[in-house]
């Protein structure tokens, strides 16, 4: 793949190969990895793992877990596999290429946690580098289908964790409400007085419906634009207590 960079996360402790342009690891990737409960054991699945930004940092944090990442883009999974080897995670992290909805068909109730960072764009409004691949994602699986695939693969009573656009929260909750319980929502805002643009959402499969818990927002930056203490801790590998 042309235009590949070799970067590091967690202050140099995790190596990551990723495209120079297009889908790259971001704060969203680190926040998603930090949102996974620290005491998890067993197996984890990331749907739409891309080049592995969230998957590899999750593997670093959750050292007793077996992790699988699946993505439709063979170029991205090749980079993720390269990063797995560079970090010495071959015994614990498996990368596969495929359409998530098809890939999970024989994986019902298999994973102890399933997490995802679904694409944020909308049809007809894609302008970032890698637009053709972005369009392929949209055609392959809707947001509703993405969440249903996650819920299908996770074990009963186990969590699914999503980071997505805050504007899609109602849609996310409408699907999760039918499939999960103990739903928690953590808004993510750049600054204290700004509107949240992202949300972390967690639900546990098969539990009874109940109140949705809306938490105080995670603020990523100070008023002068510097990383907040919480974001700095996440970048070091700390978990989010939510």
Question: Which stretches of residues belong to each language-model region?
Answer:
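Conserved Class I SAM-dependent methyltransferase catalytic core
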Residues: 21, 25, 141-196
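SAM/dcSAM-binding transferase cores
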Residues: 195-242
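Conserved beta-strand segments of alpha/beta enzyme cores
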Residues: 15, 66, 92-94, 181-184
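Class I SAM-dependent transferase core
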Residues: 1-39
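Conserved SAM/SAH cofactor-binding pocket of Class I
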Residues: 34-127
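Mobile active-site "lid"/loop adjacent to the S-adenosyl-L-methionine
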Residues: 118-145, 149
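Residue-level signal for inorganic ion chemistry
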Residues: 32, 117, 146, 203
């Amino acid at each position: 793949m042309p235009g590949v960079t070799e970067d590091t996360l967690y202050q140099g402790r995790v190596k990551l190969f990723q495209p120079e342009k297009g889908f790259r690891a971001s704060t969203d990737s680190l926040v998603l990895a930090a949102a996974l409960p620290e005491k998890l054991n067993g197996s984890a699945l990331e749907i739409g793992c891309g080049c592995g930004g969230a998957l590899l940092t999750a593997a670093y944090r959750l050292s007793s877990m077996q992790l699988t990442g699946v993505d439709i883009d063979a170029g991205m999974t090749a980079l993720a596999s390269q990063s797995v080897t560079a970090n010495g995670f071959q015994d614990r992290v498996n990368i596969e290429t495929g359409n998530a909805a098809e890939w999970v068909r024989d994986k019902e109730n298999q994973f102890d946690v399933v997490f995802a960072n679904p694409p944020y764009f909308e049809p007809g409004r894609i302008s970032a580098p890698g637009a053709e691949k972005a369009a392929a994602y949209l055609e392959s699986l809707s947001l509703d289908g993405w969440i249903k695939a996650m819920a299908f693969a996770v074990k009963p009573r186990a969590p699914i964790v999503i980071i997505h656009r805050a504007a899609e929260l109602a849609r996310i909750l409408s699907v999760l409400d039918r499939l999960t319980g103990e739903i928690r929502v953590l808004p993510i805002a750049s600054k204290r007085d700004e509107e949240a643009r992202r949300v972390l959402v967690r639900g546990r499969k098969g539990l009874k419906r109940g109140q949705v818990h809306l938490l105080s927002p995670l603020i990523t930056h100070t008023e002068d634009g510097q990383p907040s203490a919480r974001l700095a801790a996440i970048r070091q590998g700390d978990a989010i207590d939510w």
